Design a protein with these regions (language model features):
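Eukaryotic, compositionally biased intrinsically disordered regions
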Residues: 254-257
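Extended helical scaffolds that flank P-loop GTPase cores
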Residues: 1-252
């Protein structure tokens, strides 16, 4: 009846949701790959490798030109990594926007639009540090009037450390953004799953209650049937007694004999 129809409908919704859940896991897998690529550019390991190679080049340099080129290379690669990261961020954002819309249409999940993110702040910081370096460190005057080791030390203490801080901030911001991008979908999927489970359990309880009610009704009908039979028997006895009482005394004596 109605309960069976409701159960069938919820089971169908559950099957559709489970199919959507598989697509969600596929999205998570692609999202994870894209995240790894992002941190391949913006990650601190890449910056650490760049810093180490730059230090070796500057320490082993015999000409001021080599020192100058090493500093320029350091900023160039740092900027390239931020630019590549921006490209990965744009791809992640485009994919998540499409996924949000798809899940909204297919499952009625209200996701809105994914939060945007940019590394513009870090890019400006890198540009500012390079300008400072070009004005106060990477100049012919500085190269001629200061010992090479002093120039190298100053570059890593006053410039490279600030670049690292900028990348550390970029990593923290990126991690927070990635969590924020996935959170609405994860929340909606989890809530939808809970709602379906509750509906199915509720309908199961109704179904069980209906079966119990039917059993109780059948039991009452059986009791009623027994009572009707008993009442009919009593009525027959009463009728017989009444007939007996209505007969003349002689006839009653004869019957009694």
């Amino acid at each position: 009846g109605v309960v069976e129809y409701m159960m069938s409908k919820v089971r169908h919704e559950k099957e559709e949701f489970e199919a959507g859940l598989q697509r969600y896991y596929a999205v998570r897998s692609v999202f994870s790959q894209m995240t790894n690529r992002l941190f391949g550019h913006i990650g601190l390991e890449a910056l650490r490798n760049l810093t180490t190679s730059t230090r070796e080049t500057m320490t082993n340099a015999t000409f001021s030109r080599t020192l100058s080129d090493a500093m320029k290379h350091f900023f160039s690669v740092s900027r390239q990594n931020l630019n590549k990261s921006e490209g990965e961020i744009a791809e992640i954002l485009a994919m998540m926007d499409a996924v949000y819309k798809k899940f909204a249409v297919e499952h009625g999940l209200k996701l809105g639009s994914p939060t945007t993110f940019s590394l513009l702040r870090q890019q400006k910081e890198i540009n500012r540090l390079e300008q400072w370096c070009d004005a106060h460190l990477n100049t012919t005057f500085q190269m001629l009037t200061h010992d090479k080791n002093r120039v190298v030390q100053k570059f890593f203490e006053e410039v490279a450390t600030q670049v690292r801080r900028a990348f550390e901030r970029a990593n923290r911001d990126a991690e927070s953004w990635l969590k924020a991008v996935m959170a609405p979908m994860e929340t909606q999927v989890r809530e939808h799953q809970i709602q379906l489970k509750r509906r199915l359990e509720s309908i199961k309880r109704i179904h069980q209650a209906t079966e119990t009610l039917e059993d109780r009704i059948n039991e009452l009908l059986h009791v009623e049937s027994d009572l009707v039979t008993q009442v009919q028997g009593i009525a027959q006895v009463a009728y017989t007694v009444q007939r007996l009482l209505n007969q003349p005394l002689v006839e009653r004596s004869t019957l009694a004999a």
